[in-house]
Amino acid sequence: MDPYSVIIKPQLSEKTMNQIYDENKITFVVRRSANKRVIKEAFQDLYDTKVVGVNTHITPRGNKVATIELEEADAAEDIAVRLGVF
C-alpha cells in the first residue's frame, strides 16, 4: 500500500502537542482500513525514523487515529517541524 494513502494528516490538539514534547509520540489520522503493521511501515518509509509502537483508535466521527511512538529522542519534534506544525 502506498505510504501517502495510509497516513492522511497530523492530528493536532493540546494533548497531541504535549505528547510530542513529553512522550516523543506523534499522532496522525490514517486510512480506516490500515492496520498497525501497515501504519508502522508507511511511517518509517515516509519519515526515515524508527518506530517503537503504534496505538490506534476510531473517533466518534469515524476517523481512525494512530499515535506513533518514536525511538530516537526528539524525533517527534523534528518531524513536527518538518510538517509545519510549529
UniProtKB/Swiss-Prot annotation:
This is Large ribosomal subunit protein uL23. Binds to 23S rRNA. One of the proteins that surrounds the polypeptide exit tunnel on the outside of the ribosome. Pfam families: Ribosomal_L23. GO terms for molecular function: rRNA binding; structural constituent of ribosome. NCBIfam families: PRK14548.1 (NF011118), uL23_arch (TIGR03636). One of its GO terms (cellular component) is ribonucleoprotein complex. Part of the 50S ribosomal subunit. Contacts protein L29. Belongs to the universal ribosomal protein uL23 family. Keywords: Ribonucleoprotein, Ribosomal protein, RNA-binding, rRNA-binding. Coiled coil: none annotated. One of its GO terms (biological process) is translation. The gene is rpl23. Gene3D superfamilies: 3.30.70.330. The keyword RNA-binding applies. It comes from the Archaea. It comes from Methanosphaera stadtmanae (strain ATCC 43021 / DSM 3091 / JCM 11832 / MCB-3). The keyword NADP does not apply. Disulfide bonds: none annotated. InterPro entries: Nucleotide-bd_a/b_plait_sf (IPR012677), Ribosomal_uL23 (IPR019985), Ribosomal_uL23-like (IPR013025), Ribosomal_uL23/eL15/eS24_sf (IPR012678).
